[in-house]
Amino acid sequence: MSITDVLSADDIAAALQECQDPDTFEPQKFFQTSGLSKMSASQVKDVFRFIDNDQSGYLDEEELKFFLQKFESGARELTESETKSLMAAADNDGDGKIGAEEFQEMVHS
């Protein structure tokens, strides 16, 4: 699966443009611009599986650091503060990782 199988390349490019500078990543803005927030719950979970590098069923801080690169290989890494902020926004049960359900809830919040 390629991310452009489910999201428009133009929308992804626009979303990445908005957060190309360090410490400018805003999850909700990214989800809206990229089109993720308009997708069904099952489509968002498909994207989650694409982002989940080790297929563990969870995203940890190391995977989140490379979040933008899953949408475009040349994109920057998230800063430590952006990574921690993204984790805090989605990790509802406080276990230090984001499950598919938590990811979907964050995208649609």
Swiss-Prot record:
InterPro entries: EF-hand-dom_pair, EF_Hand_1_Ca_BS, EF_hand_dom, Parvalbumin. Residues 39-74, 78-109 form the EF-hand domain. GO terms for cellular component: cytoplasm. The keyword Translocase does not apply. One of its GO terms (molecular function) is calcium ion binding. It holds the Pfam family EF-hand_7. Keywords: Calcium, Metal-binding, Repeat. Ca(2+) 1 binds at residues 52, 54, 56, 58, 63. PROSITE patterns: EF_HAND_1 (PS00018), EF_HAND_2 (PS50222). Ca(2+) 2 binds at residues 91, 93, 95, 97, 102. Belongs to the parvalbumin family. This is Oncomodulin-2. It comes from Homo sapiens (Human). The lineage of its organism: Eukaryota, Metazoa, Chordata, Craniata, Vertebrata. The gene is OCM2.
